[in-house]
């Protein structure tokens, strides 16, 4: 199993042995303190040949997973086309149509992320494999390398575990159960969820009837066997695999970097494993932690923890019930759309790098469209909040501002530079650009390890470090040492990241959505959450609540460690709670996990040094472009802001020129003049939130009336549409009406009229 094994398919001949290579020496693994943590003395599992498989098992497998297996060439074209049509119409990839050959490829070489790209990869490799191996050999590979119980490879493992008998002795109802649980072994675990397992077994039996492998009577008889009575309840404790989620990452990286398989090439393996953290995570994976509890059996979890000092992976949450070797590792192999966790990394990191923003920058949340389209950018609440500080925009996760910011960045540096940036932090999942990237709507997605490493770049003042779990290997055959260096590269300038970190720290201190609950005492945390929503068609088709969402991320860091955690579901299922809704605590496990890891590993009372290139100066709050205050500006409208030295503002605020002209009428009566103004002149302004307004600085804009006679001028403030002004003289007078700020000096254009008595 694994990359090195599958590679043999393409370079060697049909006669290559598929049983594990035996060697008198075995590999050993060491933690970050050079203590041995395990030896790779692989458990001997009886290899199952095709001839060992009973007909009832083969029939159940093919009727359920691949009914045309013996007639296609690795690709079931009708099912593929049907699935693609369904997925495109629903704008999702929930529908699958993998043949057995494709499933084998997916589980031994590719990620299990449901994308069209992966489907095409499966199709290509499946077609190639079917030219090398016979149909019976492919089934043989499948049943020996797929984890039927979700833990150990091979159907024989599952058969011995559940029935205490080898696969060749299983009965029809036993075979149907084994086939039924393989696609969701955790949920359909017959020991933990016998009701769901029974329902699934019966579905398999019905499929066998549908495809004429059973009579209706035979199926009903098989359904009559209670699952609880079929199972073998052993007193033998199931084998434990300590630290396995982390170790599987180590094995994958060794294969990727050297092409060597630690299970077949004996070696000493030195890692960055933090056993204290990983032991805590192991308890969480088994749902045995007093800090973290899961209540939904279908809910999954994944996380990666990185040491910021050297960029190493020090612990990983590979998935719930992660107990076995070389399982699908959600911390390393799974990719999901990063949602709003991308905002600090993309729009705002590039804004501070290229747009020279201050940490007190003001932005506007208003109606926004994706560039060159008529598609509106919606916030999660479908509302707009007006002007706000940048820390509020991140805290409230305003989508409009993230998209507008990215658009401004693209306007300055171009789309190609944005793609280069994403590639430099290993978050580029396609070579095409899309403004929806600003919201984390990637074509495929990122893994928790990828996201943690990217956030680690912010923790490391702009230096990206390629995440490694393996430090060094020593081959036992010749004592050859192979060391692996974590590559470091500056991506963003130190001062840009310092300003962004200042914003994130301010955002955390304001405790948006109770985000500050993840912070241990005396530890400065910067973090961002993210949620992915369902397409409207999926909500309708699956009868989910309108406010249901797919998953939740939490990514963040203190000075010494970075964490990226995800929770969600492997598969979207009808009539099952494979979704979250607001105010439901199930998704909050990312916060609980984050806080617990920080409690254990975060160093207290650490902060970032302020670069010499950063200066702090007072500006008029909310001004954009930035304005320096004069002595007349009230201190309530002044805020200290940090800037790069080469982008300090130089323009002082000054009273604006008033250009509005006021139309009015008047009529005379005894001893007074009545001035008539438009009814809407005194209407209240829009209530849209504004941080900066000249009326806050210079007072309200007032309507002034001057009545002049000879060398005497009387001034009145008009405050309604009808204004009566007494006159003490009956001669020719001049009347002027104009705007003026209450505390200002400038006046608007005069509208002079002559009063003749």
Where are these predicted regions, by residue range?
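Juxtamembrane regions of bacterial inner-membrane/periplasmic proteins
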Residues: 1-286, 290, 313-314
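Short pre-catalytic segments that frame enzyme active sites
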Residues: 28, 33-46, 157, 161, ...
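Bacterial peptidoglycan biogenesis and beta-lactam-recognition machinery
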Residues: 53, 63-76, 89-94, 130-136, ...
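Conserved catalytic neighborhood of penicillin-recognizing serine enzymes
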Residues: 89-113, 235-239, 356-418, 434, ...
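A penicillin-recognizing enzyme superfamily signal
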Residues: 271-292, 304-305, 316, 323-334, ...
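Conserved aromatic anchor
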Residues: 673-683
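Extracellular fibronectin type III
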Residues: 744-755
């Amino acid at each position: 199993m694994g990359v090195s094994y599958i590679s043999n398919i393409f370079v060697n001949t049909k006669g290559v042995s598929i049983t594990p290579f035996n060697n008198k020496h075995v590999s050993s693994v060491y933690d970050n303190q050079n203590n041995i943590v395990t030896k790779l003395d692989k458990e001997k599992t009886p290899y199952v040949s095709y001839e060992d498989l009973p007909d009832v098992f083969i029939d159940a497998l093919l009727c359920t997973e691949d009914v045309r297996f013996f007639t296609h060439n690795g690709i079931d074209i009708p099912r593929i086309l049907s699935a693609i049509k369904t997925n495109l119409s629903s704008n999702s990839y929930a529908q699958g149509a993998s043949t057995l050959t494709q499933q084998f490829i997916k589980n031994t070489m590719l990620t299990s992320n449901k994308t069209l790209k992966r489907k095409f990869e499966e199709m290509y490799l499946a077609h190639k494999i079917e030219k090398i191996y016979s149909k019976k050999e492919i089934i043989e590979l499948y049943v020996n390398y797929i984890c039927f119980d979700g833990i150990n490879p091979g159907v024989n493992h599952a058969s011995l575990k559940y029935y205490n008998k080898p696969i060749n002795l299983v009965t029809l109802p036993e075979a149907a159960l084994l086939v039924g649980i393989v696609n969701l072994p955790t949920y359909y675990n017959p020991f933990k969820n016998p009701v769901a397992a029974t329902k699934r077994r019966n579905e398999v039996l019905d499929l066998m009837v549908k495809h004429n492998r059973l009579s209706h009577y035979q199926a009903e008889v098989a359904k009559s066997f209670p699952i609880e009575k079929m199972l073998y309840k052993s007193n033998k404790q199931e084998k434990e695999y300590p630290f396995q989620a982390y170790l599987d990452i180590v094995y994958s990286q060794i294969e990727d970097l050297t092409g060597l398989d630690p299970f077949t090439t004996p070696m000493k393996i030195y890692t960055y494993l933090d056993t204290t953290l990983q032991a805590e995570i192991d308890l969480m994976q088994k749902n045995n932690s007093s800090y973290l509890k899961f209540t939904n059996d279908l809910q999954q979890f994944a996380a990666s923890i990185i040491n910021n000092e050297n960029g190493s992976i020090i612990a990983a949450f590979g998935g719930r019930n992660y107990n076995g070797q070389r399982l699908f590792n959600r911390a390393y192999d799974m990719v999901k759309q990063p949602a709003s966790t991308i905002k600090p990394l993309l729009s705002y990191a590039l804004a501070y790098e290229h747009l020279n923003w201050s940490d007190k920058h003001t932005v506007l949340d208003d109606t926004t469209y994706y560039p060159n389209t008529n598609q509106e950018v919606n916030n999660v609440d479908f509302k707009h909040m007006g002007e706000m500080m940048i820390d509020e925009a991140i805290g409230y996760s305003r989508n409009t501002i993230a998209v507008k910011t990215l658009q401004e960045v693209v306007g300055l540096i171009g789309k190609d530079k944005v793609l280069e940036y994403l590639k430099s932090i290993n978050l580029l999942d396609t070579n095409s650009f899309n403004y929806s990237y600003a919201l984390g709507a990637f074509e495929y997605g990122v893994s928790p390890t990828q996201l943690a490493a990217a956030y680690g770049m912010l923790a490391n003042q702009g230096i990206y470090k390629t995440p490694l779990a393996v430090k060094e290997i020593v081959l036992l055959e010749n004592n050859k040492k192979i060391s692996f260096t974590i590559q470091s590269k500056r991506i963003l300038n130190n001062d840009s990241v310092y300003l962004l970190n200042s914003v994130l720290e301010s955002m955390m201190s304001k405790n948006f959505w109770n985000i500050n609950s993840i912070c241990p005492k005396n530890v400065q945390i910067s973090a961002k959450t993210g949620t992915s929503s369902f397409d409207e068609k999926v909500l309708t088709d699956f009868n989910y609540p309108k406010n249901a969402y797919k998953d939740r991320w939490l990514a963040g860091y203190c000075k010494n460690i970075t964490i990226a955690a995800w929770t969600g579901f492997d598969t979207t299922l009808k009539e099952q709670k494979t979704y979250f809704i607001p105010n439901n605590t199930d998704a909050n496990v990312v916060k609980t996990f984050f806080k617990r890891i920080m409690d254990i590993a975060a160093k207290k009372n650490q902060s970032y040094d302020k670069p010499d290139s950063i200066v702090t100066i007072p500006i008029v709050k909310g001004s954009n472009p930035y304005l320096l205050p004069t002595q007349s500006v009230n201190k309530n409208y002044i805020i200290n802001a940090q800037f790069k030295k080469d982008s300090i503002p130089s323009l002082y605020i000054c009273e604006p020129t008033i250009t509005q002209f006021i139309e009015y009428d008047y009529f005379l009566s005894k001893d007074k003049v009545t001035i008539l103004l438009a009814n809407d002149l005194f209407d209240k302004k829009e209530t849209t939130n504004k941080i900066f307004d000249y009326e806050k600085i210079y007072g309200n804009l007032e309507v002034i009336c001057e009545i002049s006679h000879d060398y005497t001028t009387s001034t009145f403030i008009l405050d309604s549409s009808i204004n009566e002004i007494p006159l003490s003289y009956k001669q020719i007078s001049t009347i002027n009406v104009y705007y003026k700020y209450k505390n200002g000096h400038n006046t608007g254009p005069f509208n002079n009229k002559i009063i003749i008595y």
